[in-house]
Regions:
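Pre-Walker A (Motif I) flank of P-loop NTPase domains
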Residues: 2-5, 71
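Hydrophobic anchor at the beta1->P-loop junction of P-loop NTPases
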Residues: 8
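P-loop (Walker A) phosphate-binding loop of NTP-binding proteins
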Residues: 11
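ATP-binding Walker
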Residues: 14
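Conserved substrate/cofactor phosphate-moiety recognition/catalytic segment
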Residues: 17-63
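Glycine-rich phosphate-binding loop used to anchor ATP phosphates in small-molecule kinases
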Residues: 53-96
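Conserved phosphate-donor/acceptor-positioning beta-strand/loop module used by diverse small-molecule
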Residues: 95-115
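Small-molecule kinase domains that catalyze NTP-dependent phosphoryl transfer to phosphate-bearing small molecules
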Residues: 117-160, 168
Length: 171
């Protein structure tokens, strides 16, 4: 069986991490990677050097995950609002795995509720809402499968994505 790399992208607060972790419970053996783990700099800094560091770290982890004989599914979640970033990360990985790219979408109202809840809980910075809503405009033109998270639980999303993965594996 060919391995599968499932890439979940979308704005902050749309539900990538929660749905991705649920997905790992449905597709086994699997491993979960959040791109944010590779950019947990203190203080946070966006420079050419830090961008290169993060990209190199993510590519290395994805390759190692796909090379592991004990892993059939790699679930990778990250904001990925720029198509060039996604292309650079995934370059050459199609030789190691079937790649399924999915953008999780939400209405501005739904996204605002989720991000505000995270801000109130101290899980996100106060400016996260503004950035998350601004990033919404980058996703409609991406050549990915789009799934709405509005009114859906992470379990429902994970069930749908697992079904898509299984259907593609059979075709």
């Amino acid at each position: 069986m060919m391995k599968t790399l499932i890439v979940l992208n979308g704005p902050m607060g749309v539900g990538k991490t929660t749905a991705g972790k649920e997905l790992c419970r449905r597709l086994t053996p699997s491993i979960f990677l959040d791109g944010d783990w590779c950019w947990d700099l203190h203080p946070f800094s966006v420079t050419d050097a830090t961008k290169a560091l993060v990209m190199d770290n993510i590519r290395a982890l994805l390759r190692r995950d796909l090379d592991c004989a004990e892993v059939d599914y790699v679930v990778f979640v990250w904001v990925l609002q720029q198509e060039e970033t996604a292309a650079a990360l995934l370059d050459g990985l199609d030789e190691k795995a079937r790649i399924l790219r999915i953008t999780l979408d939400a209405s501005d109202e739904s996204l605002s509720r989720r991000v505000q809840k995270d801000i109130a809980a101290g899980l996100r910075a106060p400016d996260s809402l503004e950035r998350s809503l601004a990033y919404q405009r980058f996703y409609p033109g991406q050549g990915t499968l789009h799934l709405s998270t509005d009114g859906r639980s992470p379990a429902e999303l994970a069930d749908e994505i697992a079904g898509l993965v299984r259907n593609r594996a059979e075709s």
